[in-house]
Amino acid sequence: MLNADLKQQLQQLLELMEGDVEFVASLGSDDKSNELKELLNEMAEMSAHITITEKSLKRTPSFSVNRPGEETGITFAGIPLGHEFNSLVLAILQVSGRAPKEKQSIIDQIKGLEGPFHFETFVSLTCQKCPDVVQALNLMSVINPNITHTMIDGAVFREESENIMAVPAVFLDGQEFGNGRMTVQDILTKLGSTQDASEFNDKDPYDVLIVGGGPASGSAAIYTARKGLRTGIVADRIGGQVNDTAGIENFITVKETTGSEFSSNLAEHIAQYDIDTMTGIRATNIEKTDSAIRVTLENDAVLESKTVIISTGASWRKLNIPGEDRLINKGVAFCPHCDGPLFENKDVAVIGGGNSGVEAAIDLAGIVKHVTLFEYASELKADSVLQERLRSLPNVDIKTSAKTTEVIGDDYVTGISYEDMTTGESQVVNLDGIFVQIGLVPNTSWLQNAVELNERGEVMINRDNATNVPGIFAAGDVTDQKNKQIIISMGAGANAALNAFDYIIRN
């Protein structure tokens, strides 16, 4: 089941095990059970620390990752390959006794949860943001015996996942808990546990504090650290929106990579320098005083710095039409790579004729029954090579000069209405899912009245990446820089860093 290269990598990782692990498998006579049995046997053959026993569990096929004679609460229902294979390997290492790479303060928060908490996460194996949630809840299960977690592959357990329209979908004790990417800190916050503000209030002032974790932030942090400046990053997650990007083929010198790989490499590069990286928390306010620039965090802690670089990126732009908000995660989606498999053999729409929209339509055409692409303009805006590929597909329709007006459906999406801009006629297309790909909205709601924003909510900067407030700089997709590309954001981050350094020298 595992190819030679993957086996070699796995062999090296399993050598890091620090104790014994027992797979407790619930298997039937079906094909998926046979596939799971083959996978578990292959892994057991690679390490003397792994044994397999069979036992009836809640779902078949499934298996728990336990210590001999001790249940950890970690279960995989289905076959955790694809993006979830890393989740399985990490669970094995942590259950074996390998210390988690998590801050002690977070570990203490997890230990302090009283519970019991029984989590279930529905995933698709092509979902790039699902492993973050699975790995976070698995870690919590390893640390706290009052927590259990089951990963459920929706493609295997279709009856259970029939009404799941977006992944990851997390349930706590049978009730919906959350959708989309969540960090350990996000989960802890939803459970009522917050980071101690004193952990942040006791920090010495920075020379440069970078707010955000994407490509611009990473670039800025590395450049300022190399200048010998005391540098800090405060961010929800390293990689930012790039984490949700499937393929990256235009980052020069790297022919092809994925968003998750890029983000992982960025985090590793940042870790090579003396940079105080604070993740899992967001900024809520910024103000300049006579002595310093003060950044307030969501736990009310305050960080001080001589300069600040704002690089909080952007989020998916919504259609803002009736029915959309009500049916998000119920047929309205934003990530085709994550949620596409949930619409296998169904009819879907993609809204947006730029590169992202056309790429989404191409990817979805290989999974779903039919794709209808809507573009407001009179022609598509995507690169010609993508348009040619799209038009060659037999199960794709393209509607230009189409203004979407309403998402239709009661409990779930059943259609979309649009106006033909050439005729003025209103029409309805019956379908099961809608993927919105119409660009991004800058994450600047926390900056109102702090720095100058344009009519689109973007931070206005000059050629030095400086804002209208001395000492506050900005870079990346959060700014009014016209073109939004990873490579451009990284250059902007470096430019902001060098000009922040120059500002410190002169002030």
Curated annotation (Swiss-Prot):
Classification via CDD domains: AhpF_NTD_C (cd03026), AhpF_NTD_N (cd02974)
Coiled-coil ranges from the UniProt annotation: none
Domain of life: Bacteria
Top-level EC class as recorded in UniProt: oxidoreductase
Pfam families assigned to the protein according to its UniProt record, in alphabetical order: Pyr_redox_2 (PF07992), Thioredoxin_3 (PF13192)
Transmembrane portions of the chain: none
Keywords: Disulfide bond, FAD, Flavoprotein, NAD, NADP, Oxidoreductase, Redox-active center
Binding-site residues, FAD: 207-222, 467-477
EC number assigned by the record: 1.8.1.-
GO biological process: response to reactive oxygen species
Disulfide bonds: 335-338
InterPro entries: AhpF_NTD_C, AhpF_NTD_N, Alkyl_hydroperoxide_Rdtase_suF, FAD/NAD-bd_sf, FAD/NAD-binding_dom, Ferredoxin-NADP_redctase_2, Pyr_nucl-diS_OxRdtase_2_AS, Thioredoxin-like_fold
Swiss-Prot/TrEMBL cofactor(s): FAD
Record note on cofactor: Binds 1 FAD per subunit.
A single MF term (Gene Ontology): oxidoreductase activity, acting on a sulfur group of donors, NAD(P) as acceptor
Binding site residues for NAD(+): 347-361
Self-association state and partner proteins as the record states: Homodimer.
Comment field (misc): The active site is a redox-active disulfide bond.
Function text: Serves to protect the cell against DNA damage by alkyl hydroperoxides. It can use either NADH or NADPH as electron donor for direct reduction of redox dyes or of alkyl hydroperoxides when combined with the AhpC protein.
Homology family: Belongs to the class-II pyridine nucleotide-disulfide oxidoreductase family.
Protein name per its UniProtKB record: Alkyl hydroperoxide reductase subunit F
Organism classification: Bacteria, Bacillati, Bacillota, Bacilli, Bacillales
